[in-house]
């Protein structure tokens, strides 16, 4: 973890001087005792202070810029949300600056630090990092941060209740008479922030435990090796992309199949795949409101089951 970014206000507190005195020292202005100046410059070096150039230029006013940090655009959730988020922010007078982490923790911090230097009024973050050290780092920026997709404990979250959405979807599948459930998900043993996937798995397990049906949790490639039984089987996938990989196999074997995210490709190609959809318009509008207020609590948006007769 990189050292936390220190502000001029924090530097002033460390040195026991006013913020104006710190400003004079850092900008080589007159009216400051040489020893005090030396003390401030030394502390700035020790604590890794770096100037926020844009903040100087607007003299404490709003930049009307919002930073967005997501994995990439391969996930349709992000591409669809970004389009709506840009429109919602533009209505409020904000311009968006988008950066991609490609699920690399170090790259994520580089993105955040770059946005800090541009003096964002807020950062919308789908985090790959997690834990107290990372959250303390974010708090040290003194910029409003809201999370999407994955959650951080001490920051607001805007999105769906992944646990409830998957629990209800699984209950629906069980209600259709399926007694053998196969849950398909990506690996969660990465050491990264996989909150959304963890919550979906937890929702699946909750529904299974209440019903008593048999179940297994597999990688999508493992599903191809499963034996066909007389049990009514359903494959429940934590993403539509996993479900699309298994759609033909499920059809061949007479299995039900369910995805999650309701990506546009399903309707565009007329694919028979049930999925769980959620309101990205509501997510975008909630984020825009957060930017205006500067603070926010969690905002959970609605989800719904989309039936296309694959269950």
Where are these predicted regions, by residue range?
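N-terminal helix-turn-helix/winged-helix DNA-binding helices
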Residues: 2-6, 45-77, 81-83, 92, ...
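Short, solvent-exposed amphipathic alpha-helices that sit
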Residues: 39, 77-91, 165-168, 194-214, ...
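Hydrophobic alpha-helical segments within soluble ligand-binding/sensing domains
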Residues: 158-183, 222-226, 243, 277-296
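Flexible loop/turn connectors
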Residues: 227-311
């Amino acid at each position: 973890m990189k050292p936390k970014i220190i502000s001029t206000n924090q530097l002033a507190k460390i040195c026991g001087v006013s913020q104006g005195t710190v400003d004079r020292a850092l900008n080589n202005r007159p009216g400051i005792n040489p020893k005090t100046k030396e003390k401030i410059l030394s502390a700035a070096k020790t604590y890794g202070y770096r100037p926020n150039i844009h903040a100087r230029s607007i003299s404490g006013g709003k930049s009307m810029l919002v930073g967005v940090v997501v994995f990439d655009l391969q996930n349709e959730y992000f591409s669809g949300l970004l389009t709506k988020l840009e429109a919602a922010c533009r209505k409020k007078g904000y311009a968006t600056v988008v950066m991609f982490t490609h699920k690399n923790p170090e790259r994520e911090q580089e993105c955040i630090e770059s946005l800090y230097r541009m003096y964002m009024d807020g950062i919308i973050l789908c985090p790959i990092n997690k834990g107290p050290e990372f959250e303390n780092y974010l708090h040290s920026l003194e910029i409003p941060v809201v999370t999407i997709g994955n959650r951080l404990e001490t920051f607001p979250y805007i999105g769906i209740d992944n646990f409830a959405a998957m629990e209800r979807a699984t209950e629906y599948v069980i209600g259709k008479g399926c007694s053998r459930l196969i849950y398909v998900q990506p690996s969660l043993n990465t050491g990264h922030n996989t909150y959304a996937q963890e919550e979906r798995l937890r929702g699946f397990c909750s529904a299974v435990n209440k019903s008593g049906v048999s179940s297994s949790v597999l990688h999508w490639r493992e599903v191809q090796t499963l034996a066909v039984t007389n049990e009514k089987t359903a494959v429940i996938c934590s993403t539509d992309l996993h479900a699309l990989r298994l759609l033909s196999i499920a059809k061949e074997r007479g299995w039900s199949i369910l995805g999650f995210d309701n990506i546009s490709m399903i309707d565009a190609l007329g694919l028979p795949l049930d999925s769980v959809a959620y309101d990205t318009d509501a997510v975008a509008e909630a984020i825009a409101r957060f930017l205006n207020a500067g603070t926010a609590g969690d905002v959970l948006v609605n989800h719904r089951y989309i039936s296309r007769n694959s269950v």
